[in-house]
């Protein structure tokens, strides 16, 4: 009798994706983040569903409904904070996952990489819209400032902003449509993640050495299922420490003040995971230039495969490129810090220098280091 796992049309797909999948024998813990992102997405969809049962997307009651969830709903507080801090964990895993792709040259799988960039944009859009829903001060002003950036687009900018707002300012129509989009986008993300996996399994996983591993494969289960559980335990422990001991550590105190269109907060800033892009936006004095730099700060990932000049795939045996990679990481941390600071001296200058360094490292220094390392191979 044939094993049902290998014969059943539906279970067969799961079997080929998670059980009998041939995986390289030497992939490290950096390959954990894909499965952790799947766990984060599932957690966000489930907690979000329970929150949506009690939330009302109306400007008069949105803030009160979130308060009601925390005070009156059974375990509502833990659901709300799991959702809010789960988003932070999602982005930590996401940035680690992208960083691993850049370090080990996984961007050479162009379809998988491009779908990944689409996923990154979609997750960022979803997180932004979710931040608007509690209708606190930072929700309202964050929505106003970020949507207003579209007015920098020539000719159609102003009409586009008013079309998105559903009026002449961020109001009830905006909140309702943002809730609708925030609810549907995670399911689109799930579908895109399926396509991402489909393309990945066409080629097989990359590995730290960057060379083909066709001759040395092991089954995904039990080896990597067990290995992924370790990463999962670390993720759950970190998340629960955040949720149970300091749930507001990564949030903004201004969001505990109900939205007031007549009172602007002293420092309008997005959630911490967008601060690097926000710093790049603010570092350019021109509005359209800032918006373009903001979009390009993420879109630059799409041209990394074109700029790959090295004969080696990953950075495992390329010390010069490794130095530049960690310089880029330090630069992104600097930008994140700058994004949370007020717009004054010396933060403006530091932000501008960090922004220049970010783009020049990715577009100029890394391709040059690849060429230099190719020359060094001949010595």
Curated annotation (Swiss-Prot):
Protein name: Cytochrome b
Cofactor: how bound: Binds 2 heme b groups non-covalently.
Keyword field: Electron transport, Heme, Iron, Membrane, Metal-binding, Mitochondrion, Mitochondrion inner membrane, Respiratory chain, Transmembrane, Transmembrane helix, Transport, Ubiquinone
Listed cofactors: heme b
Organism: Felis catus
UniProt GO cellular component terms: membrane; mitochondrial inner membrane; respiratory chain complex III
Chain sites annotated for binding heme b b566: 97, 196
PANTHER family: CYTOCHROME B
Disulfide bridge map: none
Presence of keyword Ribosomal protein: no
Gene: MT-CYB
UniProt family annotation: Belongs to the cytochrome b family.
Protein location: Mitochondrion inner membrane
Task performed by this protein: Component of the ubiquinol-cytochrome c reductase complex (complex III or cytochrome b-c1 complex) that is part of the mitochondrial respiratory chain. The b-c1 complex mediates electron transfer from ubiquinol to cytochrome c. Contributes to the generation of a proton gradient across the mitochondrial membrane that is then used for ATP synthesis.
Biological processes, Gene Ontology terms: mitochondrial electron transport, ubiquinol to cytochrome c
A Pfam entry, by short name: Cytochrome_B
Chief localization: mitochondrion
InterPro entries, per the entry: Cyt_b/b6_C (IPR005798), Cyt_b/b6_C_sf (IPR036150), Cyt_b/b6_N (IPR005797), Cytb/b6-like_sf (IPR027387), Cytochrome_b (IPR030689), Cytochrome_b_C_euk/bac (IPR048260), Cytochrome_b_N_euk/bac (IPR048259), Di-haem_cyt_TM (IPR016174)
Subunit field text: The cytochrome bc1 complex contains 11 subunits: 3 respiratory subunits (MT-CYB, CYC1 and UQCRFS1), 2 core proteins (UQCRC1 and UQCRC2) and 6 low-molecular weight proteins (UQCRH/QCR6, UQCRB/QCR7, UQCRQ/QCR8, UQCR10/QCR9, UQCR11/QCR10 and a cleavage product of UQCRFS1). This cytochrome bc1 complex then forms a dimer.
């Amino acid at each position: 009798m044939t094993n049902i796992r290998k014969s059943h049309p539906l279970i067969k797909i799961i079997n080929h994706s998670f059980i009998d999948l041939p995986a390289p024998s030497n992939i490290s813990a950096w390959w954990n983040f894909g499965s952790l992102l799947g766990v984060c997405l599932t957690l966000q969809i489930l907690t979000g569903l329970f929150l949506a049962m009690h939330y009302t997307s109306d400007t008069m009651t949105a803030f009160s409904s979130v308060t009601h969830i925390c005070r009156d709903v059974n375990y509502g507080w833990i659901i709300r904070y799991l959702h809010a801090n789960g988003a932070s964990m999602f982005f930590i895993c996401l940035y680690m996952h992208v960083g691993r792709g850049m370090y080990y040259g996984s961007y050479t799988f162009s379809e998988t990489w491009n779908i990944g960039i689409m996923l990154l944009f979609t997750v960022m859009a979803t997180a932004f819209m979710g931040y608007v829903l509690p209708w606190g001060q930072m929700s309202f002003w964050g929505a106003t400032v970020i949507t207003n950036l579209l007015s920098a687009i020539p000719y159609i900018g102003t009409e586009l902003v008013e079309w998105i707002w559903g009026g002449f300012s961020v109001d009830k129509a905006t909140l309702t449509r943002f809730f609708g989009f925030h609810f549907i986008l995670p399911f689109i993300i799930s579908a895109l993640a399926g396509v991402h996996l489909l393309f990945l399994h066409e080629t097989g996983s990359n590995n730290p050495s960057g060379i083909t591993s066709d001759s040395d494969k092991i089954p995904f289960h039990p080896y990597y299922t067990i290995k992924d559980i370790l990463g999962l335990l670390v993720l759950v422990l970190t998340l629960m420490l955040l949720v149970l001991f300091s749930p507001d550590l990564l949030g903004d105190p201004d969001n505990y003040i109900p939205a007031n269109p007549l009172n602007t907060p002293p420092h309008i800033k997005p959630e911490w995971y967008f601060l690097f892009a926000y710093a790049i936006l603010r570092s350019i004095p021109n509005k359209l230039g800032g918006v373009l730099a903001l979009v390009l700060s993420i879109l630059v990932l799409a041209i990394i495969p074109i700029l790959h000049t090295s004969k080696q795939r990953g950075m495992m045996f390329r010390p010069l490129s490794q130095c530049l990679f960690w310089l880029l990481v330090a630069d992104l941390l600097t930008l994140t810090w700058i994004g949370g600071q007020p717009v004054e001296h010396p933060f403006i200058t530091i932000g501008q220098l960090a922004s220049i360094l970010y783009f020049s490292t990715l577009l100029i220094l890394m391709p040059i280091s690849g060429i230099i390392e190719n020359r060094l191979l001949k010595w």
